């Protein structure tokens, strides 16, 4: 089984959609004030969907099924949030399948800084700009095969890369 990150979608920081924002200067006054207030209240929610691709190798004669996947998001080598994907996904040989993970975290639980610093971090994670940041996703899939369910014995790193501008 091969897993990779396809894309992120629906990236929001304190309810602000980040798709059209590349830097602090792109924020309107109201959004900048909302972020600053969220930081002072120590509640800066970041929500997004990470779309993974799962591919059963083309030379495999048998369909497999992803039954479950435990995952942990790491930012700057810090474990942040964990979750479980529990939707069964059929994995025909050679046909990549979308595995959408809904991820929510409070950035101020894991990082310090100004509203501008934390926006830069969020933009880096979203791949929209900011200084480079290390992002990793560790997962432990459970795959159903003709031999029965197989749980990976060790977590695998699906994504481990530096994101943001260089």
Predicted features and spans:
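Extracellular/lumenal and peripheral-membrane lipid-interaction modules
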Residues: 1-166
